């Protein structure tokens, strides 16, 4: 969470509901970042990249990678993933009604490789920390 010296001219992204109801299995989302574009020998991108990935169900994510509900999994399609250098970058659910309606689902965390078939990346679930986030931004 950042505190700006002056108000931004850009509207902030919507935050998810605390109950996690914005996240459901197989929903399309978009991950963006400047990480490497090929793994393992790629270089960080000079331009912002994005790719559409599907969110996994909680049980499938836990069974595959042993994570709890403070995390979520997305991806698993060959060649489409976040990668090295993308940590902290956004996972966004686009609702199709313009940027003002998009929801921040997660922040890129970790994975085993990049863009491997049937192997998702793990994201910090924003809704898991939403009460804390809201308490900080209201100050």
Swiss-Prot record:
Q: Does the keyword Transcription regulation apply?
A: no
Q: What is this protein called?
A: Glucanase inhibitor protein 3
- Residue intervals of the Peptidase S1 domain: 1-138
Similarity-based family:
Belongs to the peptidase S1 family.
- Keyword Secreted assigned to the entry: answer is yes
Instruction: Give the protein's function.
Output: Secreted effector that suppresses host plant glucan elicitor-mediated defense responses. Targets host endoglucanases and inhibits the endoglucanase-mediated release of elicitor-active glucan oligosaccharides from P.sojae cell walls.
Query: Where is it mainly found?
Result: secreted
A GO biological process of this protein is: proteolysis
């Amino acid at each position: 969470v950042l505190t700006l010296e002056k108000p931004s001219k850009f509207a902030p992204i919507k935050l998810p509901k605390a109950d996690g109801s914005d996240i459901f299995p197989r929903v399309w989302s978009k991950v963006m970042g400047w990480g490497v574009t090929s793994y393992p020998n790629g270089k960080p991108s000079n331009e912002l990249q994005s790719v559409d990935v599907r969110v996994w169900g909680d049980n499938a994510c836990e069974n595959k990678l042993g994570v709890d509900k403070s995390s979520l999994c997305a991806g698993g399609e060959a060649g489409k993933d976040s990668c090295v250098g993308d940590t902290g970058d956004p996972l966004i659910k686009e609702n199709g009604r313009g940027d003002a309606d998009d929801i921040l689902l997660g922040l890129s965390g970790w994975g085993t490789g990049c863009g491997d078939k049937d192997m998702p990346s793990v994201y910090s679930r924003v809704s898991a920390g939403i009460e804390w986030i809201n308490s900080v931004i209201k100050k």
